[in-house]
Amino acid sequence: MASLQCSFHFLGTNPKKYNPSSIFQSYSRTSFTKLSSRVSRQRFLRCTLSMNGCEADHKAPLGTVETRTLSTVPSPAAATERLITAVSDLKSQPPPFSSGIVRLQVPIEQKIGAIDWLHAQNEILPRSFFSRRSDSGRPDLLQDFSSDNGSSDHNPVSVAGIGSAVFFRDLDPFSHDDWRSIRRFLSSKSPLIRAYGGLRFDPTGKIAVEWEHFGSFYFTVPQVEFDEFGGSSMLAATVAWDNELSWTLENAIEALQETMLQVSSVIMRLRRESLGVIVVSKNHVPSEGAYYPAVNNALEIIKDKHSPLSKVVLARSSRIITDTDIDPIAWLARLQCEGQDAYQFCLQPPGAPAFIGNTPERLFHRKHLGVCSEALAATRPRGDSKVREMEIERDLLTSPKDDLEFSIVRENIREKLKTICDRVVVKPHKSVRKLARVQHLYSQLAGQLKREDDEFNILTALHPTPAVCGCPVEEARLLIKQIESFDRGMYAGPIGFFGGGESEFSVGIRSALVEKGLGALIYAGTGIVSGSNPSSEWNELELKISQFTKSLEHESALQPIN
């Protein structure tokens, strides 16, 4: 019985809700799914089991939520030793509570990349990574609505984590009770205790085997975490326990000590070069031949005067097989070097593929009562000269089709924010957002929540946006279910973190699912509106995945960090 209970904790589901046989009988299997089911998902033997916070009483407050900051050290090796000692001290002098969460953190004088630290940890699972994008050059509307006067120097640029102090996962759609279960472990007095993770694009859809370990949603507070700041770093260890879940402080400390013994302090700097792999095959779902009729079918519905549909986003899944395995962290590091204006993320539960992304799009950012979102739509390539760049930008700004697509997204987000905010500001009305390979129409929106507990309503109000689903959302979602023959999983879903005083979520586009022996699934989508052309939309899909495919050439190397 003990081993059975352990397996349910591993799956991250309530035993009463979970029925493996029903899941395996119900999903539609793609070629990736069929191949995936024949490959063992237990390659990563060094994984840490902990408690599923969704199974606790979300109404019962924890006994303690605290952060203990130790003295600054010069290196990651010194930080690791300091934490090992601090964890031992915690074991000998335990807090007198039946439940709680304690973060021990050691500042490091050196600035070291969080992604480099994660790559050095030799695939310890679960693992997570979240890197905030640079918003330099854009107005910070959130500042006008947030009461936070603190310095951004105290906010990590990137965060990498291994192990799980506590995780949250279920097959049922993310609910208000699930959100409260997460919030139970967070506090504004411990701002760096955060739950990193994401939600499926469509929580009501059938889960394909490649996505089964992510559940309908998946969040984790890492056991061991490396935070990268503007000029320094920090190593942290977290223990969480709840006797009601049969996960005691002693259990939590023993699990953390086991993980700490595996932590490597020998960190090599990844050169941000293309990977040395060759793509030996590529298969699109849908194929180009099937995609054109799907777009035309959507256009017929949009043109129908009896249909409320004005936009639908049709996605594509591209499976690539390579001559050697793709290292998802090295691939993400390569994407990061040209994606400073984007979020980078990695989520990998035990036994699962790695879901990585380099997304330019923010779903929302909350600081206390202030919340901001943005509209991002329409796509053009970057120009190869200043003259060509200006021509493309002018075409993007004056295109009626692109203006329609963008306006649908912006006005939909404005109306949704109005339902949860006292007032909403839009600035600028329409501009061009330039990324490394593409450019989009862009606008920022911000407002003030009536209360911080409205955070759950931000998610339900804003996701999915017309930029990744369509408008009206429900009509578009139904059409997507009818047309698309693959499981989006967390592609185009909210990816980010919940924190005590601050939360931030990106939209999980420009993303890929990477698994050993199975290559990768690369996802992309385009918005179909009146005036769309199937050939142009297919070319846009190719453009959007180019950042992934073009980064698979040449060889990546390591440089030692002194």
UniProtKB/Swiss-Prot annotation:
Top enzyme class: isomerase
Single annotated GO MF: isochorismate synthase activity
Protein EC: 5.4.4.2
Stored InterPro entries: ADC_synthase, Chorismate_C, IsoChor_synthase, MenF-like
Record keyword Plastid present: yes
Keyword Transit peptide assigned: yes
Transit peptide: 1-55
Biochemical pathway: Siderophore biosynthesis; salicylate biosynthesis
Gene Ontology biological-process entries: defense response; phylloquinone biosynthetic process; salicylic acid biosynthetic process
Reactions this protein catalyses: chorismate = isochorismate
Compartments it resides in: Plastid, Chloroplast
Pfam families, per database record: Chorismate_bind
Family as reported in the entry's similarity comment: Belongs to the isochorismate synthase family.
Function: Isochorismate synthase involved in the synthesis of salicylic acid (SA) required for both local and systemic acquired resistance (LAR and SAR) while SA synthesized through the phenylalanine ammonium lyase (PAL) pathway seems to potentiate plant cell death. Also involved in phylloquinone (vitamin K1) synthesis. Has no isochorismate pyruvate lyase (IPL) activity.
Protein known as: Isochorismate synthase 2, chloroplastic
Species this protein is from: Arabidopsis thaliana
Gene responsible for this protein: ICS2
